[in-house]
Curated annotation (Swiss-Prot):
Signal peptide: none annotated. Belongs to the GnRH family. It comes from Rattus norvegicus (Rat). Transmembrane segments: none annotated. It is found in: Secreted. Keywords: Hormone, Secreted. Its main location: secreted. Preoptic area and testis. This is Putative preoptic regulatory factor 1.
Length: 37
C-alpha cells in the first residue's frame, strides 16, 4: 500500500497531497476519491 493507513471498507484519511480525501479499499488497492464539495 502506498500509504500507511489502517485498512477499512471506506473512510477519510489525511494523506499528503490528498487532505481529507475519501478512500476506498478494493482488494489490496487504495482508491482515493476527492471529497464532494
Amino acid at each position: 500500500m502506498p500509504y500507511s493507513l489502517q485498512p477499512q471498507p471506506e473512510g477519510f484519511a489525511d494523506v499528503p497531497g490528498f487532505p481529507l480525501c475519501m478512500y476506498m479499499v478494493r482488494g489490496s488497492t487504495w482508491t482515493l476519491v476527492p471529497p464532494d464539495l
